[in-house]
Amino acid sequence: MERFQGHINPCFFDRKPDVRSLEVQGFAEAQSFAFKEKEEESLQDTVPFLQMLQSEDPSSFFSIKEPNFLTLLSLQTLKEPWELERYLSLEDSQFHSPVQSETNRFMEGANQAVSSQEIPFSQANMTLPSSTSSPLSAHSRRKRKINHLLPQEMTREKRKRRKTKPSKNNEEIENQRINHIAVERNRRRQMNEHINSLRALLPPSYIQRGDQASIVGGAINYVKVLEQIIQSLESQKRTQQQSNSEVVENALNHLSGISSNDLWTTLEDQTCIPKIEATVIQNHVSLKVQCEKKQGQLLKGIISLEKLKLTVLHLNITTSSHSSVSYSFNLKMEDECDLESADEITAAVHRIFDIPTI
């Protein structure tokens, strides 16, 4: 078997070999070679076979000028390895020349040399880097193949492991439960306190039952009633203010016709009305006297009270106008005092200050 050695062109690693173009090229060269044989039939009779081979250019019937490894691999991937022979068999019988048989023997030897290699084309193609494929797509393809090769149980376990969260300690769970219970108890206690205070504010008629819902509903109804009462009171206040303003206007109109001197005399007359008030608490007497101012009236009154066994402890004098005076006595009843009630003391004071009884 002959060994073929030659330079491997690196450009074949960057592209997939085009098998169809090789087939078409071989077919075209075979037809051109057949055409030349028809034109030179006369040479077969005159020139010996060896001279004819020496005179011909080997490039005219060898389609592969520099055989390399990738070209041989592309020839191996054909469904029927020697489709070129099938195309040539359909032509004229002139293709079965010694030159064609030599090319066939050359191709068969190349096929045997390639088939002796243990690397299949699919694996070689897989290992070759592609210019169009990106590193991300290669990584995804490799991941898909690995996932496809793994059994389904292992993939499910991986998914379950991803979904599982880190389990908490029993102490943390117990602490969370205790905190939740404490917060809930505090909330219920505050709610019960608010409900009880609200129930105390409501009238009994608004509480039908003792549950929380009835208490809250009664409070809502009671607030609505209070709003209505406030609205009615505000309306009454407005009407009262209007009526008071009318009364004041009438009084001002009436006073506008009265002179200032007459108004002063009427005020003095109202203040000069005599008044006597007596209050008895055990043996103490509180006496208030309002009367017309007279000369020596106070001294005469104190002497008269001493005769009635009423001792003056404190005295306060106020003058409200030019003609009236007000006395406030704080008296003590002696044991020999014959007066016992407030009415008796009032009658005696009327006689002392010459105030007529009403």
UniProtKB/Swiss-Prot annotation:
Q: Name one GO cellular component term.
A: nucleus
The GO molecular function terms of this record are: DNA binding; DNA-binding transcription factor activity; protein homodimerization activity
- Supply the InterPro entries for this chain: bHLH-TF_ACT-like_plant, bHLH_dom, FAMA/SPEECHLESS/MUTE-like, HLH_DNA-bd_sf
Q: Which UniProt keywords apply?
A: DNA-binding, Nucleus, Transcription, Transcription regulation
**Which terms under GO biological process does the entry name?**
cold acclimation; guard cell differentiation; regulation of DNA-templated transcription
Could you confirm whether the keyword DNA-binding appears in this record? yes
Its principal location?
nucleus
Q: Where is the bHLH domain?
A: 175-226
Give a brief account of the tissues where this protein occurs.
Expressed constitutively in roots, leaves, stems, and flowers.
Tell me where in or outside the cell this protein is found.
Answer: Nucleus
SUPFAM superfamilies, alphabetized: HLH, helix-loop-helix DNA-binding domain
**SMART domains referenced in this protein's UniProt entry, alphabetically:** HLH
Q: Which residue intervals are annotated with compositional bias (Low complexity) in the record?
A: 127-137
Q: Which Pfam families match?
A: bHLH-TF_ACT-like_plant (PF22754), HLH (PF00010)
| Superkingdom, natural source | Eukaryota
Could you identify this protein by its name?
Transcription factor bHLH67
